[in-house]
């Protein structure tokens, strides 16, 4: 089997130090990319200049204005030459031997179209990394915050430390560290730029699965992910995610790929979950030791509820 070549594309916005750490980690991956492309999405912290100074071999693309994750990735892939394109969040760090494991997976399995990483918190705790297509129950659990209680629901995300073998046993993998065979990118991509913040990964994986490709988490493709570091300070964020962006993009994914009835059901499940979360937060706020954080996060969830209520309106 021919040995696959690898390109790495890293979109970044105001994450200079994280981006440099991400780039530095590539040297431990066990396989040398044919090229590395950093797409600076209108950063104000000197990211592009720092990368050019510290790592002149890296290709730097500057968008000139904030165009969002999907557009930034698409611009980066235009500059990439590898048979396999690895899209990395700027808040990730590649583990020892991870790139070698990834390249081997694509070289050994011609049916593998998209591969995800064994994502981990800095302390080694497994993160959400892959799963089945979202169900109404899962959407309710996500919006309500009851996922840990309803951990055995259909459609749950896979978080086990072993991930999933390269067998096509998952429907989607996380875009935080997602590798795409070039043939899949050409025929099923690029990323849909109407998904500016979330669900680009689900959407591309859906197209790949429909075209007959397998999607899998690759064992030993370990990636540390500082989850939420790129969005935690954005207006409307609640901790490590942005409810309004995530929930509306989930509804848009359903509308695009599963039809209007599924989209309406998704919106109802998310609204119901959001109301449960807000009711719980109203009681928890009485005992909150960090009133400012409670108010910020609660405002984010309220914004999410309003956004979901309006997302399907003409």
Predicted regions and their residues:
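Short, flexible, basic/aromatic active-site loop/helix in glycosyltransferases
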Residues: 134-170
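Glycine-rich, basic loop-to-helix element that forms the pyrophosphate-binding segment
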Residues: 62-80, 101
């Amino acid at each position: 089997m021919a040995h696959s070549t690898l390109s790495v594309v890293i979109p970044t916005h105001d994450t200079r130090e994280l981006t440099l750490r991400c780039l530095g980690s590539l040297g431990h991956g066990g396989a040398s990319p044919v090229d590395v492309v950093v797409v600076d999405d209108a950063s104000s912290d000197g990211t592009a200049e720092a990368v050019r100074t510290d790592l002149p071999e890296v290709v730097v693309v500057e968008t000139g204005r904030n165009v969002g994750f999907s557009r930034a990735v698409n611009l980066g892939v235009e500059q990439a030459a590898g048979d396999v394109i690895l899209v990395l969040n700027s808040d990730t760090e590649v583990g020892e031997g991870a790139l070698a494991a990834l390249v081997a997976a694509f070289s050994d399995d011609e049916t593998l179209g998209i591969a995800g990483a064994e994502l981990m918190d800095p302390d080694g705790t497994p993160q959400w990394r892959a799963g089945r297509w979202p169900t109404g129950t899962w959407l309710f659990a996500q919006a309500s915050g009851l996922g840990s209680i309803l951990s055995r629901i259909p459609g749950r995300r896979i978080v086990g430390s072993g991930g999933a073998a390269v067998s096509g046993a998952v429907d989607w993998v996380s875009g935080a560290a997602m590798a795409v065979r070039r043939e899949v990118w050409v025929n099923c991509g690029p990323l849909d730029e109407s998904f500016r913040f979330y669900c680009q990964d689900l959407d591309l994986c859906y197209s790949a699965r429909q075209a007959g490709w397998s999607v899998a988490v690759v064992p030993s493709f370990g990636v540390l992910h500082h989850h939420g570091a790129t969005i935690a300070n954005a207006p409307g964020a609640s901790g490590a995610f942005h409810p309004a962006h995530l929930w509306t993009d989930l509804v848009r994914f359903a509308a695009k790929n599963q039809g209007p009835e599924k989209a309406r059901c998704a919106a109802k499940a998310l609204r119901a979950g959001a109301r449960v979360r807000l009711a719980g937060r109203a009681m928890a706020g009485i005992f909150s030791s960090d009133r400012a954080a409670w108010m910020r996060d609660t405002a984010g969830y309220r914004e999410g509820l309003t956004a979901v209520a309006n997302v399907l309106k003409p």
